Amino acid sequence: MDDRIINFEPLIEGVLIKRYKRFLSDIKLDNGEIVTAHCANTGPMKGLLNEGAKVRISYSSSPKRKLSWTWEQVEVTGINNEKVWVGINTLFANKLIKTVIEKNLLKDKLGDIATIQSEVVYGQDKKSRIDFLLTPKISNPDNRKIFIEVKNTTWKKNKIALFPDTETKRGQKHLIELKGVMPESKSVLVPCITRKDVDFFGPGDEADPIYGDLFRDSIDAGMLLIPCCFEFHKDHITWKGFKPLKLDG
């Protein structure tokens, strides 16, 4: 079975000089040229901002863009000095998970899906947008609509992928609203784990204990958790399957 899930043009390699002003990163390419790349991940990126780390960036010739380069991946040193590439472009997570849905990799967990809608307005104040709203096929035994929230997950401790890596009021609100659509609809949280060197997923209690409490409340109320793991390469991404939940360490 071919576990490649997405192919793309080979990325350009270089080393990280620095990330600054949240959105910007200076990269020294292998040919010696220094470029400024957009950094879509504005969080602390724990363990991923080591100066001199190998990185991969993409190029766009679109005249509408302020920056032609985008920082996509960074190499980190894992257990036993294993080199691991981590996907850091948070805007890519939804594309990955949509591909997983379209390839029916979630069929055993969600059943047959008829339609996929993106960025649908929902919530008590109608000011939030759910990443994906799925409508099941008539043949699906559970005919409830499925609300899916995707969380790009890069932080790792002790073989556990953790989200969030900082306090997130927005993430807290998402959990409250996911809980609110139940039981009339099904709510699903999908951590998009963009590194292969993990065995479990857990809430980032150390970074945001309130999120951790809300996460547990939502799970107890029936929210489905589907942590999806991926391995990043220079010109493709491979599917590494699901990771089980691990709480408290």
UniProtKB/Swiss-Prot annotation:
Pfam families linked to this entry: SfsA, SfsA_N
Report which superkingdom the organism of origin falls in: Bacteria
Task: Show the CDD domains listed in the entry.
Answer: SfsA-like_bacterial (cd22359)
Molecular-function GO terms, alphabetical: DNA binding
Which family does this protein fall into? Belongs to the SfsA family.
Which PANTHER family does the annotation name?
SUGAR FERMENTATION STIMULATION PROTEIN A
Q: Which HAMAP family match?
A: SfsA
| Name by which UniProt lists this protein | Sugar fermentation stimulation protein homolog
Organism of origin: Prochlorococcus marinus (strain MIT 9515)
Gene that specifies this protein: sfsA
